[in-house]
C-alpha cells in the first residue's frame, strides 16, 4: 500500500473502470434495449431514467455515494430490467468495499444485457482485486471481443498477463494502449503510470534496450517528482538493473530525505551490487528511522554474513525475529549461518521453524535434511525429503535426496525407485546415474553397473563417486589395468579419501607393482587413522552396504552454503 505520499505501480495494480464507463454504457443500452419494442410513453420513461442515472453518476464522481445510491435504487425499482442501473449500483457497492454486493449487481447487469461492456469491465476489475485472475482475464478478453479499442480493459489485461509471467503478451497489450510505434516510444501524452508498467514488462521480457529507452523518457518526464523517480527505481531494481536503480534512489533520497522506504531500497540495490559498506549505511539509516521494521535488520544480517561476521549476522536476525515472530526468511538464514559454521544441531530448530512458517520453499527441506545427513541420521533425513516430495512431486532434486537417504539406510530397492523417479524428471543426471550404477553393482548386475557408471563419467568427467565405484567394480572384476586410470583420476579429485587409496593398493598389488602398492597402503593407513581420531567410524575399502564410507558415497550431502543463500523478499515501497 502507498505510504508517505508515494504512488506505487506494480504488476497487480489495476485501472479503475467505473463511473466514466458507466456513462458510456448508457448509450450502449439504448442500442441494445432489453425490451424488444417500446411505445412512446415507455421511451420517455427510459429517457427520464437515463437522465436520472447520469445524475447519479455525477454524484458518485463527487463522492456523494448515498445520494447516488438512492437514485440508482429508484431507477431499479421503476425498471428492474434496466442493466445500466444495476451496473451503477455495483460501482457504488464496489467503491464502498462491498465486493459481494457489487459482484451481484454486475452479474445481474450482464444477465439483463450480456453485451454490456461497462458491467463486464467493472466485473473484471473486481475479480482481479479479489484474487481471481483467471476469471478476470476471461472477463477482460470478453470486453475486447465486444470493444477491441477499450483502453482500460486492454491495460488491465496487460497487467494481469504480466502478473502471470506472460510478458510478451503483456507487452503487446500495453504497447497498444500506449500507442507504441516502430521506435518503441509511447505517444507523448501517454500516462506515466502506463509507461512505468510497460517499462517493467520490457525488463521482465528481456527487452533491455526498449526498457532503457523508455526509462530515459520516464526519468526526463518525471523531472524532480520523487514519486515517479522512486517507482522507476523499483521497476529497474526488480529487473536487476541495480546501477541505474541506485542513482534513482539517491535522487529520490535527495528530494525526499530521511524516508525509510527509500533508504531501504537503496540499501538493497547497493547490496546486490556488492557495495556492502554503502549498503550498510543506507540500511542502518532506514533501521534508525523505522525501528519497528524488521526488514532493514534482516538485510543488515545478510551484509554481516557476507563479511564473515557470524555473530553480528545472528544478532541482526534475532532482532528481526523479535519484531516479527513469523519471519521464515530470518529463521532460515539463522539456520544457514549456524550450519555453515558447523553448528548443525543448533540450526535444526530454525530450519524446522522456517518450514512451518513457509512450507512452499523447497530449499528449506533440503537444508533440514542435510543436517540429519551430516549426522548420518538417514531415517530422519528421508522423512524430511519424503515430506518435501509429497509437496514438490516434480522436483528431480528431492527424489534424488529421498534415494540418497534410503541408500544410507541400506534400503536399496527404495533408493533405486527414488533415483529412477528423479531420472525420469531430469534425464542424464550424472549423480543419479552414479547412484544407480552403485546399486546395480551391489546387486551383482555388473554389466548394467558399468554402463551406468561410464555414462555418468561421460556426462561429468569430475564426478568422484562414479570414478570411485567404477574403479572398485573393475578391481572386483579383476580388470586391474582398466581400473588403474579410473582410480588415479579419482585420487586426483580427492586425495584425502582413504577408500580410493585402498582400491589403488589392491590394484597395484595384483599387478605386482610393489612400490606403488606400499605407497598407497601407507597413505590409506595414515588417512584411516586420522579419520578414526576425528571421530568418524565409517568403514573404508571394499565394504559397501549402508555404511556409506566417504569413498563410496554417491555424492556429499547437499553443499553447505559458503555465503548467504538468496532469499527473495519483496521490495518495501513507501
Predicted regions and their residues:
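Terminal, low-structured helical/coil segments at or just beyond the last alpha-helical repeat
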Residues: 28-41, 183, 188-192, 213, ...
Amino acid at each position: 500500500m502507498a505510504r508517505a505520499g508515494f504512488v506505487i505501480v506494480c504488476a497487480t495494480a489495476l485501472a479503475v473502470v467505473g463511473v466514466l464507463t458507466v456513462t458510456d454504457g448508457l448509450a450502449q443500452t439504448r442500442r441494445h434495449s432489453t425490451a424488444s419494442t417500446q411505445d412512446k410513453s415507455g421511451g420517455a420513461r427510459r429517457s427520464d431514467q437515463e437522465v436520472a442515472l447520469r445524475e447519479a453518476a455525477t454524484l458518485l464522481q463527487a463522492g456523494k455515494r448515498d445520494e447516488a445510491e438512492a437514485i440508482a435504487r429508484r431507477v431499479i425499482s421503476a425498471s428492474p430490467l434496466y442493466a445500466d442501473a444495476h451496473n451503477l449500483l455495483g460501482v457504488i457497492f464496489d467503491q464502498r468495499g462491498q465486493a459481494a454486493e457489487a459482484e451481484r449487481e454486475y452479474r445481474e447487469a450482464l444477465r439483463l444485457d450480456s453485451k454490456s461492456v461497462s458491467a463486464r469491465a467493472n466485473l473484471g476489475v473486481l475479480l482481479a482485486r479479489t484474487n481471481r485472475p483467471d476469471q478476470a482475464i476471461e472477463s477482460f478478453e470478453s470486453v475486447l471481443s465486444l470493444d477491441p479499442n477499450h483502453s482500460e480493459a486492454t491495460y488491465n489485461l496487460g497487467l494481469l498477463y504480466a502478473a502471470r509471467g506472460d510478458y510478451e503478451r503483456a507487452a503487446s497489450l500495453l504497447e497498444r494502449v500506449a500507442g507504441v510505434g516502430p521506435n518503441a516510444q509511447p505517444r507523448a501524452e501517454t500516462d506515466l503510470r502506463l509507461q512505468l508498467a510497460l517499462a517493467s514488462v520490457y525488463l521482465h521480457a528481456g527487452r533491455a534496450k526498449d526498457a532503457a529507452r523508455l526509462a530515459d523518457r520516464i526519468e526526463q518526464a518525471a523531472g524532480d517528482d520523487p514519486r515517479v523517480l522512486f517507482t522507476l527505481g523499483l521497476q529497474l531494481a526488480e529487473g536487476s538493473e541495480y546501477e541505474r536503480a541506485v542513482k534513482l534512489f539517491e535522487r529520490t533520497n535527495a528530494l525526499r530525505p530521511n524516508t525509510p522506504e527509500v533508504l531501504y531500497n537503496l540499501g538493497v540495490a547497493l547490496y546486490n551490487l556488492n557495495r556492502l559498506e554503502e549498503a550498510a549505511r543506507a540500511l542502518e539509516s532506514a533501521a534508525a528511522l523505522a525501528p519497528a521494521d524488521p526488514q532493514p535488520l534482516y538485510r543488515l544480517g545478510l551484509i554481516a554474513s557476507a563479511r564473515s561476521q557470524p555473530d553480528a549476522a545472528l544478532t541482526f536476525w534475532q532482532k528481526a525475529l523479535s519484531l516479527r515472530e513469523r519471519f521464515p526468511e530470518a529463521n532460515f538464514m539463522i539456520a544457514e549461518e549456524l550450519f555453515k559454521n558447523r553448528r548443525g544441531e543448533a540450526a535444526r530448530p530454525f530450519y524446522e521453524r522456517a518450514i512451518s512458517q513457509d512450507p512452499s520453499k523447497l530449499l528449506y527441506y533440503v537444508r533440514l535434511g542435510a543436517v540429519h545427513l551430516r549426522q548420518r541420521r538417514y531415517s530422519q533425513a528421508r522423512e524430511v525429503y519424503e515430506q518435501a516430495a509429497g509437496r514438490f512431486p516434480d522436483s528431480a532434486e528431492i527424489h534424488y535426496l529421498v534415494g540418497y537417504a534410503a541408500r544410507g539406510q541400506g534400503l536399496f530397492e527404495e533408493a533405486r525407485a527414488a533415483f529412477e523417479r528423479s531420472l525420469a524428471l531430469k534425464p542424464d543426471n550424472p549423480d543419479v546415474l552414479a547412484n544407480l550404477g552403485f546399486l546395480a553393482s551391489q546387486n551383482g548386475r555388473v554389466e548394467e553397473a558399468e554402463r551406468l557408471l561410464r555414462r555418468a563419467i561421460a556426462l561429468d568427467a569430475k564426478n568422484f563417486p562414479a570414478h570411485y565405484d567404477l574403479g572398485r567394480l573393475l578391481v572386483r572384476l579383476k580388470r586391474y589395468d582398466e581400473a588403474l586410470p579410473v582410480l588415479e583420476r579419482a585420487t586426483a579429485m580427492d586425495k584425502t579419501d582413504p577408500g580410493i587409496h585402498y582400491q589403488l593398493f589392491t590394484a597395484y598389488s595384483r599387478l605386482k607393482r610393489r612400490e606403488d602398492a606400499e605407497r598407497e597402503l601407507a597413505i590409506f593407513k595414515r588417512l584411516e587413522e586420522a579419520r578414526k581420531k576425528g571421530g568418524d567410524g565409517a568403514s573404508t575399502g571394499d565394504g559397501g552396504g549402508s555404511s556409506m564410507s566417504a569413498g563410496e558415497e554417491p555424492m556429499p550431502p547437499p553443499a553447505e552454503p559458503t555465503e548467504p543463500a538468496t532469499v527473495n523478499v519483496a521490495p518495501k515501497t513507501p
